[in-house]
């Protein structure tokens, strides 16, 4: 306990990607609010700037202080421009590789800082597997933060266990069934992540990181998931049974934190005046008529694919908000399409206030890359999905949407190997995109059924984080468990 007091001190360590920082920092805020835990966040200067003012606002509102310790990001050592300190800022595979190496170089200074802080518990992103070793050295628990669904983890566990994808007769276009799961789950070989299908001698540094991440799970005190029991009860039960590691689900963390704190958007990059203009435009649209199109902070489609998306939006009768990268190239064709589209919708370059947009009553659909944060935020808002997975666990996340009946698919079939920074798969044509949009946004019995399911799941998500709800109780149980462990070891 901290300085001889009875206050539990938990150190939070985010991975350096915006989609990882947001839920972990929100989890840190929950610990402060929910149980009066002393919280410290360890990161770098630029990454801290993404959320520092939100933490300051929490303090102004009377909440406990969260200490933020920052280290210098080794930009010079790896040849990165100043200010690029996470993967969301990397506009090419080359820059992303340098960010990855810089994170590796930060391990020793972070270890030294952890020894200096000497917390009672480490709450670490899954992609910092070395934190389990420093936790064991300090004789404190390490909680691994796995910001993904139980279904995804169950799929991955069974693929590694049964290896149906290793059959020599399977081609990249064949479908494989994942054995042993509560539902029939099938994938094409081309949709599986590289760590499953690459030969050992072809694995890269990130594949090796995934191996270390899995190994660190079994040596951690427990795993914290950003999901809620009611979303996937069969998979929560299944995974906890086969994994035999303590697991707690405390999500949807974004809604949990926004319910307890006045600021909805965590990231400080959101321009308040731009947010107001977006809301004003949405106020003029009909109920559930707008399609929100966003592919997260990392995915960068080539010009040819952007043009096909623009054609699909132009050809449909659906008003839209489309988010594209601020530094994305805007060649003549895309500018032409943007000029045609501007009377039908909004094109936002840069970061968008996603929670604000999804919560608006005019938004009736969300075309997404199937990042887990985005799926949860859509479920909370009761907004059905058009799914377009690209990389990482996104094809597995799409299966949850499919099985739960929460959306429709564009029909992506190829998992990207380079983290979505540079798309190399075939362009999906506008007609196929338009078909998926209209299938979700029309007034057919199928789309109505999808909407009913999403709205029902939204209510369950909101109830989960109310006092006495499943995630509320899980968070309480988690903190009590760590307190009991700490008090026992300090006797």
Swiss-Prot record:
Classification via CDD domains: GT1_Gtf-like
Induction (UniProt): Down-regulated after wounding.
Enzyme Commission number(s): 2.4.1.192
Gene Ontology molecular-function annotations: nuatigenin 3-beta-glucosyltransferase activity; UDP-glucosyltransferase activity
Binding-site positions, an anthocyanidin: 20, 392
Reactions that this protein is recorded to catalyse: nuatigenin + UDP-alpha-D-glucose = nuatigenin 3-beta-D-glucopyranoside + UDP + H(+); diosgenin + UDP-alpha-D-glucose = diosgenin 3-O-beta-D-glucoside + UDP + H(+); tigogenin + UDP-alpha-D-glucose = tigogenin 3-O-beta-D-glucopyranoside + UDP + H(+); solasodine + UDP-alpha-D-glucose = solasodine 3-beta-D-glucoside + UDP + H(+)
Active site as annotated: 20, 125
Tree of life domain: Eukaryota
Chain positions recorded as UDP-alpha-D-glucose binding sites: 352, 354, 369, 372-374, 377, 393-394
Tissue: Expressed in roots, stems and leaves.
Pfam families recorded: UDPGT (PF00201)
GO biological process, one term: saponin biosynthetic process
InterPro entries according to UniProt: UDP_glucos_trans (IPR002213), UDP_glycos_trans_CS (IPR035595)
Keyword set, alphabetical order: Glycosyltransferase, Transferase
Function: Glucosyltransferase involved in steroid saponin biosynthesis. Catalyzes the 3-O-glucosylation of steroidal sapogenins, such as diosgenin, nuatigenin and tigogenin. Can glucosylate steroidal alkaloids, such as solanidine, solasodine and tomatidine.
Family: Belongs to the UDP-glycosyltransferase family.
Protein name: Nuatigenin 3-beta-glucosyltransferase
The organism of origin for this protein: Solanum aculeatissimum (Dutch eggplant)
